[in-house]
Swiss-Prot record:
Keywords: ATP-binding, Cell cycle, Cell division, Cell shape, Cell wall biogenesis/degradation, Cytoplasm, Ligase, Nucleotide-binding, Peptidoglycan synthesis. ATP binds at residues 102-108. InterPro entries: Folylpolyglutamate_synth_CS, Mur-like_cat_sf, Mur_ligase_C, Mur_ligase_C_dom_sf, Mur_ligase_cen, MurD. GO terms for molecular function: ATP binding; tetrahydrofolylpolyglutamate synthase activity; UDP-N-acetylmuramoylalanine-D-glutamate ligase activity. Cell wall formation. Catalyzes the addition of glutamate to the nucleotide precursor UDP-N-acetylmuramoyl-L-alanine (UMA). One of its GO terms (biological process) is peptidoglycan biosynthetic process. This is UDP-N-acetylmuramoylalanine--D-glutamate ligase. Its main location: cytoplasm. Its EC number is 6.3.2.9. The gene is murD. It is found in: Cytoplasm.
Length: 422
């Protein structure tokens, strides 16, 4: 079979290796290629303009490529990674799948839930860690998948046993074109889920037509305290706060529902689940606190690539002066809601990246103190010169990092290095 892989990344490379083993002809097409060549694994790589849909029998799209891209528009046999993997399942091997999506918190919740389900041989994949085709080849029985809106947009058949949607706030609007498309992508899987599946959804979306018309069983949630009350867990029994408490509560709720499906009793597992969860360490660059040589508090929240994540960060330091580094690739999102929230905080802004001028204009409009620094190192230097012991220095950019860095991880590492440098 002639297979075209649209986009040359981790997901499609894993698929290419699988296709090659099964004697298929594989070609990559990507905007990053300016001429035909072979990559380091010997795969054929072509510029996007060379794609001929009549010379292809199957196209698998890398989730980061927008539905408006000419490659996607020209494709005649387009499938998502999820749908292709779903087509491989049969009576011999079909894993149990739990999918987790949301604007924020999906990585943390996926990691927490995978840890809780260790005894059931759970493995995580999708957006984090392992591509789905590698989980398939390992025949892992239980998949906990961090699932992006991009993957959900392209998926037309595959569905999980349990779908958890943590939240939906404005993000990725450049890719989706508008918020309605973004929300619909997050909810699309509910149109595919049968009566035997379960969706756990924020209460505020209860009346949405997609949810109303879905056959799936549904549980709606609002606050972490209410979830924990239903699970008969005191909120002070968990060592997390703010958004991380909600992530933990939702991981426990999914775990409890999974046990129920398996005809196992929650009370037999509850105490051990709490012990495991309280031993969980939040990953780097997510509200990661550290101190400089003068003992002043700095917080690396580089993973805050959208407004909602920064709003959550601000709540944590409600009664302290905050020196906030903000800016980067804002992905077409209107930052006004962030500036409206600044009215409730004592905050000084240090604007970096490609959105610095937009941030400066909004700061003037909302009468918020703002220095245009452009570079992260300059922002750190400015804060170092004024930061008091009882104040907070916070990197929570509300923006992606790719205008200046290779990833949010690099942005966070450089932030820490600049702070700790003499």
């Amino acid at each position: 079979m002639k297979i075209s892989l649209l986009g040359h990344g981790k997901t499609t490379l894993a698929l290419a290796r699988f296709f090659k083993k099964n004697h298929n002809e594989v070609k990559f097409f990507d905007d990053q290629f300016t001429s035909f060549h072979k990559d380091r694994e010997g795969f054929l790589c072509h510029p996007s303009k060379d794609f001929n849909p009549n010379d292809s029998q199957l196209e698998v799209v890398s989730p980061g490529i927008s539905f408006t891209h000419p490659l996607v528009i020209k494709a005649k046999h387009l499938v998502s990674e999820y749908d292709y993997i779903d087509s491989l399942f049969d009576l011999v091997f079909t894993p149990t799948i739990i999918s987790i999506s949301g604007t924020n918190g999906k990585t943390t919740t996926t990691e927490m839930l995978t840890m809780l389900l260790e005894d059931f041989k759970a493995v995580s994949g999708g957006n984090i860690g392992t591509p789905l085709i590698e989980l398939f080849e390992k025949q892992s029985p239980l998949w906990v998948l961090e699932t992006s809106s991009f993957s959900l947009h392209y998926t037309n058949k595959a569905y999980p046993l349990i779908y958890l949607l943590i939240n939906v706030e404005a993000d990725h609007l450049t890719w989706h074109c508008n918020f309605e498309n973004y929300l619909n992508a997050k909810l699309k899987v509910l149109t595919l889920m049968p009566k035997t599946s379960l969706a756990i959804i924020p209460l505020k979306f209860k009346e949405h037509p997609i949810i109303q018309n879905s056959q799936a069983q549904k549980i709606f949630f609002d606050k972490s305290e209410e979830i924990l009350e239903c699970l008969k867990i005191p909120s002070n029994a968990l060592f997390f706060k703010g958004a991380f408490l909600l992530d933990a509560a939702l991981a426990l709720l999914v775990y409890e529902q999974f046990l129920k499906i398996k005809n196992l009793k929650w009370q037999d597992y509850r105490e051990n689940a709490l012990k495991r969860l309280n031993a969980f360490k939040i990953g780097s660059h997510k509200m990661e606190e550290f101190r400089d040589k003068q003992g002043r508090l700095w917080v690396d929240d580089s993973k805050a690539t959208n407004i909602d994540a920064t709003l959550q960060a601000l709540k944590t330091f409600k009664n302290q002066k905050i020196h906030l580094i903000v800016g980067g690739d804002i992905k077409g999102v209107n930052l006004t809601p962030l500036f409206e929230e600044f009215k409730n905080h004592e905050v000084s802004l240090y604007a970096i990246g490609s959105s610095a001028s937009i941030i400066q204009a909004l700061a003037l409009e909302f009468n918020v103190s703002c220095q245009v620094c452009l570079k992260l190192e300059k922002a750190v230097q400015e804060i170092k010169s004024v930061l008091s012991q009882n104040e907070i220095a916070l990197l929570s950019p509300s923006a992606a990092s790719l205008d200046q860095f290779s990833s949010y991880k690099e942005r966070g590492e450089k932030f820490k290095a600049f702070v700790l440098k003499d």
